[in-house]
Amino acid sequence: MVVIRLARGGSKKRPFFNIVATDSRSRRDGRFIERVGFYNPLAAEGEEGLRLAQDRLAYWQGVGAQLSPTVARLVKQGAKAAA
């Protein structure tokens, strides 16, 4: 099953997350199918903290990919900020 979830990057104490479409059996930071965005929880004022490719997100959901709870929250937050 394909899931859309966060893959952690960055360095110690400075997290950065890629939002990726991956097989559910893959490790958290392992192989993924496609990167559909990023989330930077420590973004400074004026920096972009969240970017999502809405078209690719819609495609993956259309073919049956499940969102992780955190990604679902971020998608909702991103839609609210865009409106």
Swiss-Prot record:
The keyword Ribonucleoprotein applies. GO terms for cellular component: cytoplasm; small ribosomal subunit. It comes from the Bacteria. GO terms for molecular function: structural constituent of ribosome. HAMAP family: Ribosomal_bS16. NCBIfam families: S16. This is Small ribosomal subunit protein bS16. The lineage of its organism: Bacteria, Pseudomonadati, Pseudomonadota, Betaproteobacteria, Burkholderiales. The gene is rpsP.
